[in-house]
Every structure is written in C-alpha cells, then in structure tokens.
C-alpha cells in the first residue's frame, strides 16, 4: 500500500446561529486534536466578505495556532498572493518561522478568496493578470533569498531566519502545475474546488519538475472534502448537507451560516440542482472509516499524490472532529 501522509485544512466555517468567535475557537481546538492524532500538517484558508467563513487572515491565525501546538506543521491554504505585497508576505512568514521554527508552510494561490470587488478593495493595484502573479512569486523567492536589489541597496524581508518556509503552490485548474514545477515548489491540488484534473496536473508537475534547495524532489498534496462517520446513514447526512452547501454557494445563497441537516433534508431540488449535486460529488469522499480509507488510497495511488489533506464543513463542530478522529484511527495514526 502506498505510504500516504494525512493532513487537515480548516476554513473556520460559521454554522447558522453561531458566531465567528466560536468558529475560530473550534479551529484552535481542532489543531490541538490534529496534533494529538498525528496529522502531518494543518493549514488554514483566506476568505473575504463571506458570511459563512471566519478565516480571513491565515497569517494571524497561524501565529496563535503555533502558540498552542508543539510539533504539527502549520500553514496557509492559502495566502491569496494578489491581495498582498510580496514583501509583506515574506516578512509575515519569516516572523511566523521564529514562532515555530521548521513548522511553517507558505501555501499561495491566485484566487481572490471572495468576490472581485472585495479583492479590488484589498489591493487597489490588482490587475487580475497571471503575469503579475508569476512576478509576485519570483519576488517572494527573491525576498526569501535576500536578493532584492534596488538602486538604494538590498531590501531584506525582516526578520532574517535560518530556514525559509517552503512555498506550496495551490491550483484547482492545473495551470499552476507548470509554474510550480519550473520554480521547484511544492504542488497542492484543490480537488475540493475542482472535481477533475488532479491526475493530469500532477503528471505535468512531476515530469517538468526542476529540483530546488527546499524541494529536491517533487511533492504533491491533494486537498479534498472528507466526511467520515460511524454509520453509512450519518455519512449520507453529512454528504447531503455538504452538497447542499455547494449548491447554495454556487447560487450565492449562503447568507446565514451553515444550516443543519434537518433544515435541508426535504429541500425541493430541481433536476438541474440534482445534476449539479451529482457533479459535485467528485469533490468529496464520504462513508464509514473503511470506505473512506479505500477511497483515499485509490485517489492517492491513481494520482500519484504523496499526501491527502482533508477538509470538512459540518453544521455541528463535533461531527467534523469525529470525522477526523475516525480518519486518523482507520489509518492507524491513533
């Protein structure tokens, strides 16, 4: 059997009737459990102007997570680079490296993490051009290598640290696989966003990969929704709830937080709705522990991934916690 590492991604989602404060508290509690259960890394996301997600500043949240953990790797999944100055991102993650030496990952992406208007307010200079994103990545690497030269001298990202956080490039379309390979970065494919394309993107990445100091060989993560439950009935409820949330997000109708299953179980779906839900099923893995284990092994083997990063959205925080506990158990981590 392929040796698969398991990690977690959390977005600090807000359930209907709950608060953002509690959502962040649940994330903090979850990272401690993830460390106890033996997960390899724990990443948090960047989203803006979304009523159902509290995680807007991963660099701030990671600092707190570092203070309550000892060994687990912590990172961003990801920093949406066009929203930020490359220098400021380099400084933020070097500072995080001083809090948790050897435990920080910098996952970067080019999506806005919200709507285009909000992205423009975050960075009024954002032209939404791919070439600008590539330039920012180059700048980021130069800052990490203390090689940014201006007419007035070298500009350094402070503080200077012994080890730089590894850069992971996030992609959901596969286009960034070329860039990640050419630059010698890690690749994280977001199958939780895009149901298809992981295998092709990873093949391109591994074929083109140019070794770098931090990544002497290609490394691949696939991030996917994982819902693991004690019974098939419970797994079905969690899956249907998540598919409903996807549908509402696509329609722009998630305004009051994540709803409970009882509220949506009799929803009058149209034929088009059901078709979308069926298509979105490929973005997730759901079932009992053994069923989930088989699907994860098949996914990692088929796509040649080194690591699976599990994410989950549930109305009850304890359902998410139980899901990840069962996942750790079935893989023999606890």
What name fits each language-model region?
Residues 2-20, 83-147, 187:
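Flexible, glycine-rich active-site loops centered on histidine and acidic residues
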Residues 177-196, 201-202:
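A conserved active-site cap/scaffold subdomain adjacent to cofactor or substrate pockets
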Residues 1-69:
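N-terminal beta1-alpha1-beta2 module of alpha/beta enzyme domains
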Residues 10-25, 79-87, 161-171, 280-289:
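Active-site mouth loops of central-metabolism enzymes
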Residues 6, 38, 46, 65, ...:
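Conserved, mostly hydrophobic/aromatic
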Residues 127-156, 197-304:
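An alpha-helical appendage that flanks or caps ligand/catalytic pockets
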Residues 1-2, 62-70, 97-103, 147, ...:
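Acidic (Asp/Glu)-rich catalytic clusters
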Residues 6-10, 42-44, 74-76, 104-108, ...:
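Hydrophobic faces of well-ordered beta-strands that scaffold small-molecule active sites
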């Amino acid at each position: 059997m392929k040796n698969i590492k398991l990690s977690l991604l959390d977005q600090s989602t807000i359930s209907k009737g709950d608060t953002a404060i509690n959502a962040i508290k649940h994330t903090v509690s979850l990272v401690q459990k993830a460390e106890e259960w033996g997960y390899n890394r724990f990443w948090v996301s960047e989203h803006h102007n979304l009523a159902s997600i509290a995680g807007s500043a991963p660099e701030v949240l990671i600092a707190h997570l570092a203070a309550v953990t000892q060994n687990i790797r912590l990172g961003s999944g990801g920093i949406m680079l066009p929203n930020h100055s490359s220098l400021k991102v380099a400084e933020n993650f070097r500072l995080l490296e001083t809090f948790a030496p050897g435990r920080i990952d910098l996952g970067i992406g080019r999506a806005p993490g919200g709507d285009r208007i909000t992205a423009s307010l975050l960075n009024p200079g954002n032209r939404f051009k791919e070439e600008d994103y590539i330039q920012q990545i180059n700048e980021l690497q130069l800052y990490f290598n203390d090689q940014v030269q201006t007419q007035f001298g070298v500009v350094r990202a402070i503080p200077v640290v012994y080890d730089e956080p590894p850069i992971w490039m996030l992609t959901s379309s596969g286009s960034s696989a070329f860039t990640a390979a050419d630059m010698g970065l890690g690749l994280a494919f977001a199958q939780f966003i895009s149901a298809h394309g992981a295998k092709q993107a990873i093949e391109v990445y591994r074929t083109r990969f140019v070794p770098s100091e931090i990544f002497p060989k290609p490394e691949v993560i696939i991030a996917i929704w994982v819902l693991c439950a004690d019974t098939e009935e419970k797994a079905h409820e969690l899956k249907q709830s998540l598919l409903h949330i996807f549908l509402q997000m696509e329609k722009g109708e998630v305004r009051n937080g994540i709803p409970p299953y009882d509220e949506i179980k009799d929803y009058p779906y149209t034929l088009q709705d059901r078709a979308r839900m069926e298509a979105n099923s490929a973005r997730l893995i759901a079932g009992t522990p053994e069923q989930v284990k088989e699907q994860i092994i098949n996914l990692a083997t088929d796509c040649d991934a080194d690591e699976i990063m599990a994410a989950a959205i549930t109305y009850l925080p304890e359902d998410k916690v139980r899901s990840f506990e069962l996942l750790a158990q079935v893989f023999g981590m606890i």
